[in-house]
Design a protein with these regions (language model features):
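Sequence-level preference for short, compositionally simple segments enriched
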Residues: 2-395
Length: 395
């Protein structure tokens, strides 16, 4: 995506904002309001988590304790309150296998790795959306990690005792974060299903979050399909009743199909998106926003890197993304009723493994063909809301 490419690429497949248009797409704009639309919160101005912990600090260490699992510390934080005081959970270097639930209504929690790098603290498990509830029980609660009366018991039971044929995408997450004001810092979350399955649809989420004012800093989030799901508490039919704001900064995200997706208002800054071909999934997509049709903004990606492995750049090319027409499998896309994903990728670098002529694909779920927007119609519901500004090609 050199300057020459930007000037000659057809606007019918690659819509580019003007300078005046791009000036309105800022972090402040994306974070101007949040929470329930019936009584929204005001602007959010996140700052990096750099100061030493204040208030309660719970120590997690798999060898010494006092908490040997992350969930034990989360349970203690939820049980002891108060609801408005931040709880810091310090996680010692090591590998922690198991699911972590941060239930709705929990106090503000900061989970942070105490190692020198995010690789030093690793939360992991192999989960597949195709698992039966019985398989989920065996993977998640084989040793009684979750018990009646635990703060997360209801969340666990909702999946394990559902009676459904498959657990579904959200339940495949290694970390499920459903409270507001969560901060995750300096650690790795890995759904280790990875390349142990075929290239068909195997949603395997590393992190699911639907709270407001969520901060993700210096994380490594690794999976294949559906690595990071940034959702909201709105119903999936397409109209927003709730806005979840998420700031993703200085992170590494890895996957193959729709691996950053959802309905949140999210800003990504200095993030490395790495697309892999190792599972043989074929065409790859990074972003898959499902922005409610009545919200003007979804994903803002700025000053980021998009890279691919050696399987791309010859006959196979990755795409920057596609819209996710969430909830419209039976009806097809319906303007003014179906979600219409919004994303702007700006001031970022793509390697040669990406499609520079048609970076946006047909919508997930419905197969709706990509239709580029033009100046003056960026939020029209009969076109896609996927655009770029001042990106370039490099290593």
């Amino acid at each position: 995506m050199t300057e020459a490419m930007l000037k000659t690429a057809p606007l019918s497949t690659r819509p580019i904002l003007s300078r005046d248009e791009a000036a309105t797409y800022t972090r402040e704009h994306y974070f101007a309001r949040g929470g329930w639309l019936a009584a929204p919160d005001g602007p959010w101005h996140p700052v990096p988590v750099t100061s030493p912990p204040e208030g309660r600090v719970l120590q997690v260490d798999a060898r010494k304790g006092p908490y040997r699992t992350v969930q034990q510390a989360v349970n203690a934080a939820v049980a002891s309150g108060p609801r408005d005081a931040r709880v810091w959970i310090a996680i010692a270097p090591g590998v922690y296998r198991g699911v972590v639930y941060l239930p709705a209504g929990a106090p503000p929690v900061t989970l942070y790795g105490t190692g020198e790098t995010p690789q030093d603290v690793r939360l992991e498990l192999a989960l597949d959306a195709r698992f039966t509830p019985q398989q989920y029980q065996a993977a998640v609660n084989a040793h009684g990690e979750f018990q009646p009366g635990d703060p997360a018991w209801r969340d666990y039971q909702r999946i394990a005792a559902s009676g459904a044929a498959e657990i579904g995408t959200r339940a495949s997450a290694v970390v499920i974060a459903q409270s507001d004001d969560i901060q995750l810092v300096n650690l790795s979350i890995v759904n280790t299903l990875l390349d142990h399955i075929d290239g068909a649809a195997h949603q395997a989420v590393a992190l699911y979050a639907d709270g407001d004012r969520v901060q993700l800093e210096r994380l490594r989030l690794i999976s294949r399909q559906d690595t990071l799901w940034l959702s909201s508490r709105s119903a999936p039919q397409g109209e927003a009743t709730h806005i979840s704001r998420v700031w993703v900064a200085d992170c590494y995200l890895e996957g193959d199909v729709d691996y950053v997706f959802g309905s949140a208002s999210a800003v990504f800054e200095r993030v490395h998106f790495h697309t892999v071909s190792s599972r043989g999934a074929g065409e790859a997509f990074v972003l898959a926003p499902s922005t409610p049709y009545n919200l003007p903004v979804g994903f803002l990606v700025q000053q980021c890197r998009f890279t691919t492995d050696s399987g791309f750049g010859h006959t196979l090319y990755a795409k920057a993304g596609r819209a996710w027409d969430h909830g419209a499998r039976e009806t097809g896309y319906q303007p003014g009723r179906t979600a219409n994903g919004q994303a702007l990728v700006r001031d970022s670098v793509f390697d040669t493994g990406f499609d520079t002529t048609a970076p946006w694909g047909a919508a997930a779920t419905t197969g709706r063909p990509f239709v580029a927007s033009r100046r003056g119609e960026r939020n029209e519901l009969r076109v896609n809301r996927l655009v770029e500004y001042q990106n370039r090609q490099g290593n």
